[in-house]
Every structure is written in structure tokens, then in C-alpha cells.
Amino acid sequence: MKDLTERQRKVLLFIEEFIEKNGYPPSVREIARRFRITPRGALLHLIALEKKGYIERKNGKPRALRVSKSIRNKIPLIGEIRAGEKREAVEYLEDYIEIPESFLSSGYDHFLLKVKGESMIEEHICDGDLVLVRRQDWAQNGDIVVAMVDGEVTLKKFYQRGDTVELRPANREMSSMFFKAEKVKILGKVVGVFRKL
């Protein structure tokens, strides 16, 4: 999965969803229209996906393609997050990991982060775990969130009172962090935890 660019991944997902909804694959023009690119650009993406083994095409026939390797439930692992102090936000694609569909919220993007640190151990989120994050820009009190403050990200429980946000660890040995609400950007809500035994 590392061999797909982000745009190729999105094109492949679009093809899969289009087939599921309509019963047949999209045309090159429909792909181009969806991504606001030229038909030639769409064709180049299809050629790349075919070379990488994700689709099969029959040359010269419209809509003659099929998906040979699905990525529907493959979620991007985009790096690490500290469950402790804040850390500079660096997003880089490490891999794609297949996640059961029942873990995914319909209509939302998801991503995975590898946890570093012990600030969330009382919520059973440990060093080395993978957290499944539903991408959203809001949170309710008590949600476990990925939050960004001054360009740095952290994994904490979210509480807001008035214009003050508390990012609270789930470890009694650590202290909460308090910020003005406008300084805190929610990147997503944790909806699952995966651990190797």
C-alpha cells in the first residue's frame, strides 16, 4: 500500500464507491470531473493504478475496468502521537492497515496514529498502541481527541468550560493542560484502539 500516492488512493476509493453505488465503473471523464483534473490526468492515474496491480483495464473499451485489489477498509497510518507532552505536528504516511468496516463511521475519513507515552493508560491506551481516529473538528466533553495547539499535537481527553479548554491525561501522575478555546484545534476523535499482544 505504500506504493500509492494519496491522489491515487483517492481515485481508487472513488472507483470502488462508484461501482458499489452504480453497478458499473466510472468513465475517465467522470473521474476527471470528480477530481477537477483533465481526462488525460485521470487516464494517467488509471495507468498507474493498473501498473501497481490495483485495477485491470481493457484498452479501447469505455468503463472496461475492474478493481483487483481493494483498499476500502485500508486506513492510513500517518505517524506517531505523544500521549504525554505536546509534539510538533508531522504527518507522514507510513502504511495502510486493514480495519474491519464495523469500526468505521460512515461518511467520515479515518486515520491511525501510533501512541508514544503513558499519559492515557487509565483509558487503556498504552505506549505502542494504534489509535483509530475519526477525522472531525469538534469534540464533546470527555471525548478522547487528537488536538493541535500552537502547531503541536497531543492525545488527551477534552473538556471545555466557557472559553477554556482542558486537555486532560488519563494518568493520575500527569497534569492537565489548559488553553484558550481559540488556540485548540481538534483534528479528530479516537474511536478505536488496536494492540499487539
Curated annotation (Swiss-Prot):
Keywords: Autocatalytic cleavage, DNA damage, DNA repair, DNA replication, DNA-binding, Hydrolase, Repressor, SOS response, Transcription, Transcription regulation. InterPro entries: LexA (IPR006200), LexA-like (IPR039418), LexA/Signal_pep-like_sf (IPR036286), LexA_DNA-bd_dom (IPR006199), LexA_repressor (IPR050077), Peptidase_S24_LexA (IPR006197), Peptidase_S24_S26A/B/C (IPR015927), WH-like_DNA-bd_sf (IPR036388). Coiled coil: none annotated. GO terms for molecular function: DNA binding; serine-type endopeptidase activity. It comes from the Bacteria. It is an enzyme of class 3 (hydrolase). Pfam families: LexA_DNA_bind, Peptidase_S24. One of its GO terms (biological process) is SOS response. The active site is at S119 (for autocatalytic cleavage activity), K156 (for autocatalytic cleavage activity). It catalyses: Hydrolysis of Ala-|-Gly bond in repressor LexA. The record marks A83, G84 as: Cleavage. The keyword ATP-binding does not apply. Residues 28-47 bind DNA. Its EC number is 3.4.21.88. SUPFAM superfamilies: LexA/Signal peptidase, Winged helix' DNA-binding domain. PANTHER family: LEXA REPRESSOR (PTHR33516), LEXA REPRESSOR-RELATED (PTHR33516:SF2). Belongs to the peptidase S24 family. NCBIfam families: lexA (TIGR00498). Represses a number of genes involved in the response to DNA damage (SOS response), including recA and lexA. In the presence of single-stranded DNA, RecA interacts with LexA causing an autocatalytic cleavage which disrupts the DNA-binding part of LexA, leading to derepression of the SOS regulon and eventually DNA repair. Homodimer. HAMAP family: LexA (MF_00015). This is LexA repressor. It comes from Thermotoga petrophila (strain ATCC BAA-488 / DSM 13995 / JCM 10881 / RKU-1).
